[in-house]
Amino acid sequence: MTVVYHELLPDSYLLILAPSRSDEPEAALAHSLHCAQRSGKPAVWVDCGMLHSLSDEAAQLLWGAHHQLEEKHSQLVLVHVPERVKKDLLKRELGPAPCMVPTLLDAARQTAQQRDDQAV
C-alpha cells in the first residue's frame, strides 16, 4: 500500500492510500500510521477510496492502529471505503470495528461528535 498524501489538520491526521504491488510489504502504511498516532490528534482519518482490496498485513495494521488509538481516547475513521476493502478488513474482525463513513465531511462530524461525547 502506498500513502499518497498525509496532512496534519486542526482536529485530525489525514492519510490517503493508494494500491501498490501486492507483494510489497506494508512499511509505508506502518510508518504513516505510527506518525499519525503520535500526532496527538483526536482522530486519524484514512481515505481508502483508491483501494480495490486490502492485504492481510494492511488489515492487521489498521486494526492495530484502531485499538491503540482507542486506548488513547482517539479514533480511527475510515473514509470512502469500497465494499471489497470493508469485507477484507472485517474478515479479520478483532472486536468493535473502526468507524467507517462515506465522506470526509462525515469524518469531521464523527470526530466532533466524539469530542463532544468525551467532554460530557
Predicted regions and their residues:
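Conserved phosphotransfer microenvironments
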Residues: 55-58
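Internal alpha/beta domain cores that form substrate/cofactor-binding pockets in large enzymes
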Residues: 61
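STAS-like cytosolic regulatory interaction modules
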Residues: 1-52, 64-120
